Amino acid sequence: MKRAVVVFSGGQDSTTCLIQALEQYDEVHCVTFDYGQRHRAEIDVAQQLSASLGVRAHKVLDVTMLNELAASSLTRDNIPVPAYDPSASGLPSTFVPGRNIVFFTFASIYAFQIEAEAIITGACETDFSGYPDCRDEFVKALNRAVNLGMARELRIETPLMWLNKAETWALADYWQQLPLIRHQTLTCYNGIIGDGCGDCAACHLRARGLDQYQQNPTSVMLEMERKTGLA
């Protein structure tokens, strides 16, 4: 039996990964992390989506100690969420240091226990938001460290790594779940479900990608299929 663990936040990217995993694996588990995020609604959204999509099990793990160590506008009310600024440089205030190191490692431990072969994450380098822990180089390095530390060949899969946001929308549409992704996921840094606030960087990236896909659905779909091997 093919088992996978999806690192699941209830946002656009991880929900798209979950939808695909349910098509490609016999048994899918989700792991969501409570890291003291300021918008607790994302945990509720993740629980609702995992239940409605029919995953085998959904674990919410407490890693709130991360909030004590890593200050970020996603975890601290006194650090404002910045509006989208294409000229911004350096690490954004929304970066949570060590978050994906913790998430992927804990998900790997869970995968080890249930004898899953893959950990799936929505990390993406193409629409790079300044997060070093979303880079392909980082994921591969951590995957190697996990396998060495556990003496087991686990795979950290990143189905969206080389897709832009328009192609991520196309992938959702390929699996006939674009409306669910658009209206029921929570990607917004200000905690607004669906199309979000429209002002933060996450909402801007999501809306721009949807617009690009809707303008050229056939060509974007073909490019997504070429990149993912779904053609």
Curated annotation (Swiss-Prot):
<keyword id="KW-0479">Metal-binding</keyword>
<feature type="binding site">
    <location>
        <position position="197"/>
    </location>
    <ligand>
        <name>Zn(2+)</name>
    </ligand>
</feature>
<dbReference type="GO" id="GO:0008616">
    <property type="term" value="P:queuosine biosynthetic process"/>
</dbReference>
<keyword id="KW-0547">Nucleotide-binding</keyword>
<comment type="function">
    <text>Catalyzes the ATP-dependent conversion of 7-carboxy-7-deazaguanine (CDG) to 7-cyano-7-deazaguanine (preQ(0)).</text>
</comment>
<keyword id="KW-0436">Ligase</keyword>
<dbReference type="Pfam" id="PF06508">
    <property type="entry name" value="QueC"/>
</dbReference>
<keyword id="KW-0862">Zinc</keyword>
<keyword id="KW-0671">Queuosine biosynthesis</keyword>
<dbReference type="GO" id="GO:0016879">
    <property type="term" value="F:ligase activity, forming carbon-nitrogen bonds"/>
</dbReference>
<dbReference type="GO" id="GO:0008270">
    <property type="term" value="F:zinc ion binding"/>
</dbReference>
<comment type="pathway">
    <text>Purine metabolism; 7-cyano-7-deazaguanine biosynthesis.</text>
</comment>
<feature type="binding site">
    <location>
        <position position="203"/>
    </location>
    <ligand>
        <name>Zn(2+)</name>
    </ligand>
</feature>
<feature type="binding site">
    <location>
        <position position="200"/>
    </location>
    <ligand>
        <name>Zn(2+)</name>
    </ligand>
</feature>
<protein>
    <recommendedName>
        <fullName>7-cyano-7-deazaguanine synthase</fullName>
        <ecNumber>6.3.4.20</ecNumber>
    </recommendedName>
</protein>
<dbReference type="InterPro" id="IPR014729">
    <property type="entry name" value="Rossmann-like_a/b/a_fold"/>
</dbReference>
<dbReference type="GO" id="GO:0005524">
    <property type="term" value="F:ATP binding"/>
</dbReference>
<feature type="binding site">
    <location>
        <begin position="8"/>
        <end position="18"/>
    </location>
    <ligand>
        <name>ATP</name>
    </ligand>
</feature>
<comment type="similarity">
    <text>Belongs to the QueC family.</text>
</comment>
<feature type="binding site">
    <location>
        <position position="188"/>
    </location>
    <ligand>
        <name>Zn(2+)</name>
    </ligand>
</feature>
<keyword id="KW-0067">ATP-binding</keyword>
<dbReference type="InterPro" id="IPR018317">
    <property type="entry name" value="QueC"/>
</dbReference>
